């Protein structure tokens, strides 16, 4: 089959109109405009655009440029600036807007780590959401930390907190209970963030903006109350933005999301992104075991013996069924 000819990217006016080429890092993305911190200046940030036909080879997303990207841009005599190239990414976090959507967006790129902020009360973060985020981080080689916020609301339910903490720490994840209200865990959070570029993600209403305000005094990001009717937050962050931390490093704030659709996974790969399932699968009788019904499946045996949590296995099945709708069922 003949290959389609590739159109030449025309990401800016003609080179003759441009008076300088610069490089920098994208620190803010609103979807239609990007702010770039220039390498060759004392903290100068300039607004840039990309042309509508700008695309990265091999990746089709709603945002061709993501916060954290290293970019090349042309600045023109009229003051406008256009991004002309994006350097190869070390890694990134990508998601589908919803389970029904085929469009994907990159939350951030070139990360040293990511933190999922979850809450066990007001609102409750679903374990499926947690597991989908962690699986995506595994898939794209981004070390993940689980931050459990609003621990001050769990004074009468610390057993739940300890159970969730034990579950994810036993798998191998770092879990940090924090409270922006009491200050619990904030010093540990600073230790993990120092000198690193870290994405912060989570459902709306889990307190991401409040935590960032505590970590960066004077920033004053907008926060919002939780709906008493639906126990959900409202979106106060509407675009991704990168902030320098006063103790060194960068933190990337992203809009709160209600769902986390995975992308670019095959059914055979999904188990690789659940560390405890992947470890158990070494003992399966068949190399192509789906861990759903096959005889001699070591994963199903581990599930039966409570060495794999039912909630984690359910999350594994949910991703399988998202890829191949309705094919996989929990064992009876």
Model regions and ranges:
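A short macromolecule-binding patch
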Residues: 43-53
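Short, Lys/Arg- and Gly-enriched loop/turn segments at beta-strand edges
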Residues: 78-86, 124-126
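Short boundary/loop segments of OB/S1/cold-shock single-stranded nucleic-acid-binding domains
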Residues: 1-22, 74
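Conserved beta-strand/loop subsegment of P-loop NTPase cores
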Residues: 110-118, 141-151, 171-178
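Helix-rich effector regions associated with P-loop NTPase G domains
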Residues: 17-20, 32, 47, 57-77, ...
